[in-house]
């Protein structure tokens, strides 16, 4: 066994600056923050419940490295933190999961078996403060991916799973479904050239009628086509939107998109999931190739969940969604998911009995009853346990409330 010399730093020693002085801990970079125990417990309890739900649907867990090779073609390449290792290789901190999942599938499951259902959870880092699921530069996601299959049933499964995940958190959410290819097909069917379509995509995505009119005049778009473009920006609402979209669909691609969404809607209804549709979604969704969706809840104007269908390298179909843990935990009702009560245990035997009964237990460090009572009240611990008996903390007579082994 190696002997530790007096010059070796102890594992619990304070970090030292180059001059031997303790490092300052008073400041943090913009976009990161400390997470205190109450929030941590709430977030991690939610993470555990979501992971268990995904497992119950057949989604097996994988873990992915936080460090990746920097890739200029990465969808978040311009937003990723980059660093150089000792060999001069440029690395990047993980900035999203779908690309990493694609690499994992290609490396470890090139032949399936498909469909492949995977779940993940962990931190992401973004150099900028904008992302689909958070304004922080360091944040947590839990997600699910369904790889190797496509079609109505696969899309409906993910929508139903997303709905179940939000229900696990006890929130009332609206699932908004889009299909970016519908707008692209409508613009193509209108006979507009590529550069004009590119300019119009952005205006439609922002639902800017003024910009649409300006671009239409600049590029000589006919009044009839301009009216159709305005109609695209208004395709938001319940299933009646699909009826309106059928009228605007003048080509095969647009018609196929509407029929697919109609079939997905019917399948989702069978699963008890109600959908809203936003068919004016255009280029907001990067690499997605089919159906897309987001979930919104009252009290926050950013989505707590987002996902859609995409193609992995080699054309393998995939679809999935990610949940922003910080956002969902922030709007989750108190006590949902339910958490076990934590009690103050006066000895090891009491702690063991409490934990065996499904309670959390903190072990007393002193025999001073007044000090323990003060601590329990400050921590919000309602009861303490001695032997196999749970006792109220507040009453002076410590009246027995119940028994652990009852």
From Swiss-Prot:
S-S pairs: none
Keywords attached to this entry: Amino-acid biosynthesis, Cytoplasm, Histidine biosynthesis
Entry keyword annotation includes Amino-acid biosynthesis: yes
Matches recorded under CDD domains: HisRS-like_core
Subcellular location: Cytoplasm
Pathway participation: Amino-acid biosynthesis; L-histidine biosynthesis; L-histidine from 5-phospho-alpha-D-ribose 1-diphosphate: step 1/9
Main location: cytoplasm
GO biological process: histidyl-tRNA aminoacylation; L-histidine biosynthetic process
InterPro entries referenced in this protein's UniProt entry, alphabetically: aa-tRNA-synth_II/BPL/LPL (IPR045864), HisRS-like_core (IPR041715), HisRS/HisZ (IPR004516), HisZ (IPR004517)
A GO CC annotation given for this chain: cytoplasm
Signal sequence coordinates: none
Gene Ontology MF term list: histidine-tRNA ligase activity
Subunit field text: Heteromultimer composed of HisG and HisZ subunits.
Protein family membership: Belongs to the class-II aminoacyl-tRNA synthetase family. HisZ subfamily.
HAMAP family per UniProt: HisZ (MF_00125)
Other noteworthy facts: This function is generally fulfilled by the C-terminal part of HisG, which is missing in some bacteria such as this one.
The protein's role, per its UniProt record: Required for the first step of histidine biosynthesis. May allow the feedback regulation of ATP phosphoribosyltransferase activity by histidine.
PANTHER family per the UniProt record, alphabetical: HISTIDINE--TRNA LIGASE, MITOCHONDRIAL-RELATED, HISTIDYL-TRNA SYNTHETASE
Name of this chain's protein: ATP phosphoribosyltransferase regulatory subunit
Lineage: Bacteria, Thermotogati, Deinococcota, Deinococci, Deinococcales
């Amino acid at each position: 066994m190696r002997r530790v010399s007096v010059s070796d730093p102890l594992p619990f020693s304070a970090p030292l600056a180059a001059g031997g002085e303790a490092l300052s801990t008073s400041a943090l970079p913009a976009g990161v923050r400390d997470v205190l125990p109450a929030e941590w417990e709430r977030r991690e309890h939610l993470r555990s419940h979501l992971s268990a739900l995904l497992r119950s649907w057949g989604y097996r867990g994988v873990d992915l490295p936080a460090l990746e090779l920097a890739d200029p073609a990465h969808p978040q390449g311009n937003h990723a933190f980059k660093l150089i290792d000792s060999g001069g290789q440029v690395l990047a901190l993980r900035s999203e999961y779908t690309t990493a999942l694609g690499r994992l599938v290609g490396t470890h499951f090139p032949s399936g078996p498909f469909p492949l259902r995977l779940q993940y959870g962990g931190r992401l880092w973004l150099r900028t403060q904008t992302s689909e699921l958070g304004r922080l530069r360091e944040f947590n996601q839990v997600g699910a991916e369904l790889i190797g299959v496509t079609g109505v049933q696969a899309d409906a499964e993910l929508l139903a799973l997303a709905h179940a995940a939000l229900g696990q958190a006890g929130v009332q959410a609206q699932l908004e479904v889009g299909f970016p290819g519908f707008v692209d097909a409508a613009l193509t069917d209108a006979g507009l050239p590529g550069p004009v379509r590119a300019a119009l995509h952005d205006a439609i995505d922002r639902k800017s009628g003024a910009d649409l009119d300006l671009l239409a005049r600049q590029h000589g778009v006919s009044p009839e086509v301009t009216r159709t473009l305005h109609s695209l920006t208004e395709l938001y609402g319940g299933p009646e939107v699909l009826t309106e979209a059928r009228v605007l669909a003048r080509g095969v691609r647009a018609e196929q998109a509407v029929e697919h969404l109609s079939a997905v809607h019917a399948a989702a209804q069978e699963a008890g999931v109600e959908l809203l549709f936003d068919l004016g979604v255009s280029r907001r969704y990067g690499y997605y190739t089919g159906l897309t969706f987001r979930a919104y809840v009252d009290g926050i104007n950013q989505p707590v969940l987002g996902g859609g269908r995409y193609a992995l390298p080699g054309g393998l179909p995939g679809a999935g969604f990610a949940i922003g843990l910080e956002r969902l935990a922030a709007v989750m009702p108190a006590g949902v998911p339910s958490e076990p009560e934590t009690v103050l245990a006066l000895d090891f035997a009491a702690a063991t009995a409490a934990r065996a009964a499904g309670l959390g237990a903190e072990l007393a460090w002193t025999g001073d009853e007044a000090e323990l009572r003060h601590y329990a009240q400050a921590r919000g611990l309602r009861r303490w346990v001695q032997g196999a008996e749970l006792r109220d903390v507040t009453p002076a007579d410590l009246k027995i409330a119940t028994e652990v082994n009852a």
